[in-house]
């Protein structure tokens, strides 16, 4: 397959105002996508966004491009990414488009697509869009131009769907929880879901202003959530990222509960109910402690490459239903078609309520190995991982760890970062080995 020119592992993403996230390019992207999608069916797309200030500009650019290709667009306004996937299916649209850079800062943004089935676009469709992008932009005749309209009941529809995934025999009455929406797309959705199911909720990160998305709140920074859970003496806390496809939780003692632990709780609960279908998919970043804990329960486990796209591929390949990344992407294919943080939260909470155990107690069956993750920013086209210095440092650490740990070095698919992960049984040695590799990477940048 030809190499992608524009699409990364999660759509098209970058710094707003710089290629490819400019009004001109996004308008042409809308047109190119419209040209490809128009050949497939209803000529209707659902478009959602997170709360970044640039979303308004990019929304208008997309609208112009899609209209020029003859497609109708329905806009949801701020809406979680998984909500757009769900609404794309229920409205029988040809595609869903999300304007978001997920967990990134406000000055980044991106465009990602869903198929009519609410899944990531197939590779051949992405390549077809890329081919159109290299052609001159044209416009259909005036009578065939696309129209745009607002989808006014999008939030209510999605709230009801989320609630439908929570067992009818259970209630959140008596549950006190803190909800952190990262000043992002879940700010008007998640609090209502939990409140309508009976919980007492305290909210943080629910006042978006266009530039505060993911800033010191949300799934990528749970310090505010940890403090609030302790201050309010809450049963637990839930943090989402800017577009609502990542979840991190906090127990009543302020301990962070990551995507690995969340998947473990959900899988173990499904096993207890006799409803587990197959095993669990993790990634190369998944903690070895999860692999060991699942093995102890007799639950199969496999690793995919990093990225929810690859977790999904492994799930479909094995016909399994539960997959996760430790960063908080949790995919539950018996309920949704993509990572959905609110739905994942509800399944963990159902386990808490149904078992009458605390979140901390539910995590006790899994012991996390000490793991150090460092991100090193680099500039230019040269990949530091290709240097002999970095390769030698990695080989040395792997020899020292033997079978009692892992090293993973990778280039981010969405940012100019080198990610260094070292994992092992001894926390002090893991930190020391990670520093050895980080120094080599920095010297090679």
UniProtKB/Swiss-Prot annotation:
Family per record: Belongs to the phosphohexose mutase family.
InterPro entries the UniProt entry points to: A-D-PHexomutase_a/b/a-I, A-D-PHexomutase_a/b/a-I/II/III, A-D-PHexomutase_a/b/a-II, A-D-PHexomutase_a/b/a-III, A-D-PHexomutase_C, A-D-PHexomutase_C_sf, A-D-PHexomutase_CS, Alpha-D-phosphohexomutase_SF
GO cellular component: cytosol
SUPFAM superfamilies, alphabetized: Phosphoglucomutase, C-terminal domain, Phosphoglucomutase, first 3 domains
Protein name: Phosphoglucosamine mutase
Catalytic activity from the UniProt record: alpha-D-glucosamine 1-phosphate = D-glucosamine 6-phosphate
Lineage: Bacteria, Pseudomonadati, Pseudomonadota, Gammaproteobacteria, Vibrionales
Modifications after synthesis and translation: Activated by phosphorylation.
């Amino acid at each position: 397959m030809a190499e992608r020119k524009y699409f990364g592992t999660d759509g098209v993403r970058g710094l707003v105002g710089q290629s490819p996230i400019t009004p001109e390019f996004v308008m042409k992207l809308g047109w190119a996508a419209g040209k490809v999608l128009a050949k497939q069916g209803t000529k209707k797309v659902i478009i959602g966004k997170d709360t970044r200030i640039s979303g308004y500009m990019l929304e208008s650019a997309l609208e112009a491009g899609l209209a020029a290709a003859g497609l109708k667009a329905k806009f949801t306004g701020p809406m979680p990414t998984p909500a757009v996937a769900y609404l794309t299916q229920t409205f029988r649209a040809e595609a869903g488009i999300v304007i978001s850079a997920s967990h990134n800062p406000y000055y980044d943004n991106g465009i990602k697509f869903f198929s009519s089935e609410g899944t990531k676009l197939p590779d051949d469709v992405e390549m077809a869009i890329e081919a159109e992008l290299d052609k001159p932009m044209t416009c259909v005749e005036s009578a065939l131009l696309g129209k745009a309209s607002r989808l006014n009941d999008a939030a209510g529809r999605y709230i009801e769907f989320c609630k439908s995934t929570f067992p009818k025999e259970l209630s959140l009455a008596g549950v006190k929880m803190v909800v952190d929406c990262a000043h992002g797309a879940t700010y008007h959705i998640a609090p209502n879901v939990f409140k309508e199911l009976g919980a007492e909720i305290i909210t943080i990160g629910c006042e978006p202003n266009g530039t505060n998305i993911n800033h010191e709140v949300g799934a990528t920074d749970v310090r505010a959530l940890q403090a609030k859970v302790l201050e309010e003496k809450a049963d637990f806390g839930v943090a989402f990222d800017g577009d609502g496809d990542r979840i991190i939780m906090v127990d009543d003692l302020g301990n962070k509960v990551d995507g690995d632990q969340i998947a473990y709780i959900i899988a173990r609960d499904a096993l207890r109910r006799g409803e587990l279908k197959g095993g669990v998919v993790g990634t190369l970043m998944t903690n070895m402690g999860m692999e060991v804990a699942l093995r102890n329960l007799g639950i199969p486990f496999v690793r995919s490459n990093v990225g929810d796209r690859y977790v999904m591929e492994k799930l479909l390949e094995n016909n399994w239903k539960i997959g996760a990344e430790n960063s908080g992407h949790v995919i539950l294919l018996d309920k949704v078609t993509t990572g959905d943080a609110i739905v994942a939260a509800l399944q963990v909470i159902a386990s808490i309520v149904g078992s009458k155990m605390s979140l901390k107690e539910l995590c006790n069956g899994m012991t996390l190995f000490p793991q150090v993750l460092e991100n090193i920013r680099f500039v230019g086209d040269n990949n530091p991982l290709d240097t002999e210095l970095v390769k030698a440092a990695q080989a040395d650490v792997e020899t020292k760890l033997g079978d009692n740990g892992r090293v993973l070095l990778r280039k981010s698919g969405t940012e100019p970062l080198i990610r260094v992960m070292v994992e092992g049984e001894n926390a002090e040695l893991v930190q020391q080995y990670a520093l050895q590799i980080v120094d080599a990477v920095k010297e090679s940048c």
